[in-house]
Amino acid sequence: MACANAKQVEVHDPVMAKEGDTYYVFSTGPGITYYESKDMENWSLTGRVFPDEPSWAQRVAPGFNGHLWAPDVIEKDGKYYLYYSVSAFGKNTSAMGVTVNETLDPESEDYQWVDYGIMVQSVPHRDHWNAIDPAIVQDDDGTYWMSFGSFWDGLKLVKLDDDLVRLAEPQEWHTIAARPGASDNTSDPGEGAIEAPYIFKKNGYYYLFVSFDKCCRGMDSTYNIRVGRSKDVTGPYLDRDGKSLVEGGGTLVLEGNDDWVALGHNSAYTFEGKDYLVFHAYETADNAIQKLRILPMSWDDGWPVVDEADLNTRTTNLLEK
């Protein structure tokens, strides 16, 4: 069974960044929870991005409970851009915003998050997509794009302005992945269980990681990680069998096992010349509590591979600061 010698880092929807010699993990939680580490194994709680909540959160989602969802963080020209979402669970009453800082280190005199507000909003009975799970990628031409979405009629890609805090004009949108089972009712997500896009550039390809099936159901969770690839950031993304992700394709990267009932909502990085897959996994021995996993990622004939055994050996320990 999985190692339980120390309290592990409990996160949902983790993303990472590195500033200097310090790694940071940001996750879904009150105000966006984040942690720091020198070695990617031993972590301490840093704090939260928002001490309260974005000023617009209650207006977008009247039932907002303080939890900001599924962040992504990137660095450009010495500034850090953190994207996040506000949503009502199971509804597309959602919006994504961005907040900017000159550093991730709260001990720095330059540390101050400046929120730029809503970038994209979805409204029930108007939009057949969901404005959650933002993730940013820069294409080979230097243009930045945001992938996002869940359920409904699939995952989207939209071009960003050079300032990274608004959409480019004229707007350019693409559907990059979808699954059968989306409802015709704009307020109903249907059974097309797909979410959490993340695009990772490697060896001339854009790799689109997605999560299939159900998260957040405890021991009933069925989450798993899939992938497709494209030579063009806008797609089409095809799996290893040549099936388009827009048509429900997706090559399995990793799924649950006896020790970990389910796992998903990944990001991917290259640190110090090595590739990593970062995600949360629900531990069977701990009542399906979600734990941070950072697994080495290798490549087989141009496709990402992680070792299932690393789920048990690559633990992440929470330390007292």
Q: Model segments located where?
A:
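Carbohydrate-active catalytic/glycan-binding domains of CAZyme proteins
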Residues: M1-K321
